[in-house]
Amino acid sequence: EKAARKEAMQKALKEATLVPYSIMELCLESLTVVEMGLGCTNTNAASDLGVASLNLKSAVQGAWLNVLINLGGIRDEAFVNEYRTKGEEILQKALPLADKIYNEILQSL
């Protein structure tokens, strides 16, 4: 029973990791959509793009914290390494993009 319980916990932790990881992917995708709106809106709507970039930045960071907490309990090193690497890659793209969007909006106001 202990082995079955441990196996079930490992499976649950992996599934729990995939949810915030998918949120990270969606945040990055959303940031690219927000970026496409730069320069294509009036000033009033432009501020909404800046707010969106801030919200998406905090969402991707929060999701990353959830990924990390779940990875900490997973014994499958290949899984841990894969999602740690993939998550870090998303962060390396998303955080500068969110900052770029925000700063461009800020300068345009």
Report the location of each language-model feature.
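A structural signal for small-residue-enriched, beta-sheet-centric alpha/beta enzyme cores
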Residues: 1-109
